[in-house]
Amino acid sequence: MISCGGKRILRRNDGEEGSLPVSDELEVLQSVTARLEGANIPYMVTGSMAANFYAVPRMTRDIDLVIELSDRDVDRVTRLFQVEYYIDRDMVQRAVRDHAMFNMIHNAMVVKVDCVVRKETEYRREEFARRRAVSVAGQRIFIVSPEDLILSKLDWAKESRSQMQLDDVRNLLRSVQRLDTEYLNRWADRLGLIELYQEVCQ
Protein backbone atom coordinates (compact mmCIF):
# COMPACT_ATOMS: atom_id res chain seq x y z
CA MET A 1 0.00 0.00 0.00
CA ILE A 2 1.31 3.42 -0.96
CA SER A 3 1.48 5.93 1.88
CA CYS A 4 2.29 9.57 1.35
CA GLY A 5 1.12 12.98 2.41
CA GLY A 6 0.02 12.34 5.96
CA LYS A 7 -1.13 9.85 8.54
CA ARG A 8 -3.89 7.36 7.92
CA ILE A 9 -7.33 8.20 9.30
CA LEU A 10 -10.53 6.24 8.90
CA ARG A 11 -13.19 8.82 9.60
CA ARG A 12 -14.24 12.26 8.44
CA ASN A 13 -13.97 15.43 10.49
CA ASP A 14 -17.21 17.29 9.71
CA GLY A 15 -17.46 20.86 10.88
CA GLU A 16 -13.84 21.57 10.01
CA GLU A 17 -12.90 25.23 10.07
CA GLY A 18 -11.06 26.71 7.12
CA SER A 19 -10.61 29.79 5.04
CA LEU A 20 -10.53 30.93 1.45
CA PRO A 21 -9.12 34.19 0.10
CA VAL A 22 -11.70 36.99 0.17
CA SER A 23 -12.72 37.56 -3.44
CA ASP A 24 -15.62 37.85 -5.85
CA GLU A 25 -15.37 34.07 -6.24
CA LEU A 26 -15.87 33.52 -2.52
CA GLU A 27 -18.87 35.86 -2.50
CA VAL A 28 -20.44 34.00 -5.43
CA LEU A 29 -19.65 30.63 -3.82
CA GLN A 30 -21.43 31.69 -0.63
CA SER A 31 -24.41 32.97 -2.63
CA VAL A 32 -24.77 29.82 -4.73
CA THR A 33 -24.34 27.34 -1.87
CA ALA A 34 -26.74 29.26 0.38
CA ARG A 35 -29.43 29.07 -2.32
CA LEU A 36 -28.85 25.37 -2.87
CA GLU A 37 -29.01 24.74 0.88
CA GLY A 38 -32.22 26.76 1.12
CA ALA A 39 -33.76 24.71 -1.67
CA ASN A 40 -32.57 21.39 -0.13
CA ILE A 41 -30.52 20.56 -3.23
CA PRO A 42 -27.51 18.40 -2.25
CA TYR A 43 -24.16 19.65 -3.59
CA MET A 44 -20.45 19.70 -2.92
CA VAL A 45 -17.66 22.09 -3.89
CA THR A 46 -14.79 20.53 -5.82
CA GLY A 47 -12.01 21.62 -8.17
CA SER A 48 -9.66 24.53 -7.51
CA MET A 49 -11.87 26.17 -4.89
CA ALA A 50 -11.80 22.98 -2.80
CA ALA A 51 -8.04 22.69 -3.32
CA ASN A 52 -7.66 26.26 -2.08
CA PHE A 53 -9.53 25.31 1.11
CA TYR A 54 -7.27 22.36 1.89
CA ALA A 55 -3.90 23.59 0.62
CA VAL A 56 -1.87 26.61 -0.48
CA PRO A 57 -4.25 28.73 -2.59
CA ARG A 58 -3.68 29.50 -6.24
CA MET A 59 -5.56 31.91 -8.46
CA THR A 60 -8.86 30.65 -9.85
CA ARG A 61 -11.77 32.34 -11.56
CA ASP A 62 -14.11 29.37 -11.74
CA ILE A 63 -16.20 27.56 -9.15
CA ASP A 64 -16.85 23.82 -9.58
CA LEU A 65 -19.79 22.04 -7.97
CA VAL A 66 -21.23 18.54 -8.08
CA ILE A 67 -25.01 18.60 -7.63
CA GLU A 68 -27.69 15.94 -7.18
CA LEU A 69 -30.52 16.81 -9.58
CA SER A 70 -33.43 15.02 -11.22
CA ASP A 71 -35.83 16.00 -14.01
CA ARG A 72 -38.22 17.59 -11.55
CA ASP A 73 -35.47 19.98 -10.38
CA VAL A 74 -34.78 21.62 -13.76
CA ASP A 75 -37.31 24.45 -13.48
CA ARG A 76 -36.62 24.91 -9.79
CA VAL A 77 -32.87 25.39 -10.33
CA THR A 78 -33.45 27.74 -13.25
CA ARG A 79 -35.80 29.92 -11.20
CA LEU A 80 -33.42 29.85 -8.26
CA PHE A 81 -30.65 31.59 -10.18
CA GLN A 82 -32.16 33.30 -13.23
CA VAL A 83 -32.37 36.82 -11.76
CA GLU A 84 -28.72 37.33 -10.79
CA TYR A 85 -27.10 34.72 -13.04
CA TYR A 86 -27.08 33.83 -16.69
CA ILE A 87 -28.47 30.29 -16.79
CA ASP A 88 -29.91 28.34 -19.73
CA ARG A 89 -32.81 26.04 -18.85
CA ASP A 90 -32.19 23.77 -21.86
CA MET A 91 -28.56 23.32 -20.83
CA VAL A 92 -29.67 22.37 -17.32
CA GLN A 93 -32.16 19.88 -18.73
CA ARG A 94 -29.54 18.25 -20.99
CA ALA A 95 -27.07 18.05 -18.10
CA VAL A 96 -29.64 16.31 -15.90
CA ARG A 97 -30.54 13.89 -18.70
CA ASP A 98 -26.91 13.02 -19.51
CA HIS A 99 -25.39 13.43 -16.02
CA ALA A 100 -23.20 16.10 -17.56
CA MET A 101 -22.27 19.72 -16.85
CA PHE A 102 -24.08 23.04 -17.13
CA ASN A 103 -22.77 26.42 -16.12
CA MET A 104 -24.06 29.74 -14.93
CA ILE A 105 -22.42 33.15 -14.77
CA HIS A 106 -22.97 35.84 -12.15
CA ASN A 107 -24.18 38.85 -14.13
CA ALA A 108 -22.44 41.54 -12.07
CA MET A 109 -19.20 39.81 -11.08
CA VAL A 110 -18.78 37.67 -14.23
CA VAL A 111 -17.79 34.63 -12.16
CA LYS A 112 -18.58 31.29 -13.81
CA VAL A 113 -19.97 28.36 -11.84
CA ASP A 114 -19.61 24.91 -13.44
CA CYS A 115 -22.19 22.44 -12.14
CA VAL A 116 -21.74 18.72 -12.77
CA VAL A 117 -24.80 16.53 -12.22
CA ARG A 118 -23.65 13.62 -10.06
CA LYS A 119 -23.11 10.40 -12.01
CA GLU A 120 -24.66 7.11 -10.91
CA THR A 121 -21.46 5.09 -10.62
CA GLU A 122 -20.36 3.31 -7.45
CA TYR A 123 -17.40 5.62 -6.99
CA ARG A 124 -19.31 8.86 -7.60
CA ARG A 125 -21.99 7.79 -5.11
CA GLU A 126 -19.36 7.03 -2.47
CA GLU A 127 -17.47 10.25 -3.23
CA PHE A 128 -20.65 12.29 -2.70
CA ALA A 129 -21.52 10.42 0.49
CA ARG A 130 -18.06 11.33 1.89
CA ARG A 131 -18.42 15.08 1.33
CA ARG A 132 -17.62 17.23 4.36
CA ALA A 133 -19.55 20.02 6.02
CA VAL A 134 -17.04 22.80 6.71
CA SER A 135 -17.30 26.37 7.93
CA VAL A 136 -16.08 29.13 5.61
CA ALA A 137 -16.46 32.71 6.84
CA GLY A 138 -19.11 31.49 9.28
CA GLN A 139 -21.19 29.72 6.62
CA ARG A 140 -21.66 25.96 6.33
CA ILE A 141 -20.52 24.68 2.96
CA PHE A 142 -20.30 21.08 1.73
CA ILE A 143 -16.97 20.25 0.14
CA VAL A 144 -15.40 17.17 -1.44
CA SER A 145 -13.14 15.18 0.88
CA PRO A 146 -9.39 15.68 0.32
CA GLU A 147 -8.98 12.03 -0.69
CA ASP A 148 -11.66 12.30 -3.37
CA LEU A 149 -10.27 15.63 -4.56
CA ILE A 150 -6.90 13.93 -5.04
CA LEU A 151 -8.54 11.09 -6.98
CA SER A 152 -10.52 13.52 -9.14
CA LYS A 153 -7.42 15.54 -9.98
CA LEU A 154 -5.51 12.36 -10.83
CA ASP A 155 -8.39 11.35 -13.10
CA TRP A 156 -8.39 14.77 -14.82
CA ALA A 157 -4.62 14.52 -15.29
CA LYS A 158 -4.67 10.93 -16.56
CA GLU A 159 -5.44 11.81 -20.18
CA SER A 160 -4.22 15.41 -20.33
CA ARG A 161 -1.07 14.94 -18.24
CA SER A 162 -1.86 18.41 -16.92
CA GLN A 163 1.08 19.57 -14.83
CA MET A 164 -1.20 21.97 -12.97
CA GLN A 165 -3.45 19.11 -11.80
CA LEU A 166 -0.45 17.03 -10.74
CA ASP A 167 1.02 20.02 -8.88
CA ASP A 168 -2.33 20.44 -7.11
CA VAL A 169 -2.18 16.78 -6.02
CA ARG A 170 1.35 17.19 -4.67
CA ASN A 171 0.25 20.35 -2.87
CA LEU A 172 -2.65 18.46 -1.26
CA LEU A 173 -0.42 15.55 -0.23
CA ARG A 174 1.96 17.98 1.48
CA SER A 175 -0.75 20.09 3.11
CA VAL A 176 -3.38 17.64 4.40
CA GLN A 177 -2.11 16.00 7.56
CA ARG A 178 -4.68 13.22 7.90
CA LEU A 179 -5.42 11.25 4.75
CA ASP A 180 -7.12 7.87 4.48
CA THR A 181 -4.38 6.15 2.49
CA GLU A 182 -6.24 2.82 2.48
CA TYR A 183 -9.17 4.52 0.70
CA LEU A 184 -6.81 6.32 -1.70
CA ASN A 185 -5.00 3.12 -2.64
CA ARG A 186 -8.20 1.12 -3.07
CA TRP A 187 -9.88 3.60 -5.39
CA ALA A 188 -6.71 4.61 -7.24
CA ASP A 189 -6.33 0.93 -8.12
CA ARG A 190 -9.98 0.43 -9.10
CA LEU A 191 -10.07 3.63 -11.17
CA GLY A 192 -6.85 2.84 -13.03
CA LEU A 193 -4.95 5.68 -11.35
CA ILE A 194 -2.47 3.75 -9.24
CA GLU A 195 0.58 4.41 -11.44
CA LEU A 196 -0.11 8.14 -11.50
CA TYR A 197 -0.66 8.10 -7.74
CA GLN A 198 2.70 6.35 -7.28
CA GLU A 199 4.32 8.99 -9.49
CA VAL A 200 3.09 11.96 -7.44
CA CYS A 201 4.02 10.22 -4.19
CA GLN A 202 7.68 9.91 -5.18
Label every PLM stretch briefly.
Residues 2-202:
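Compositionally biased terminal segments of proteins
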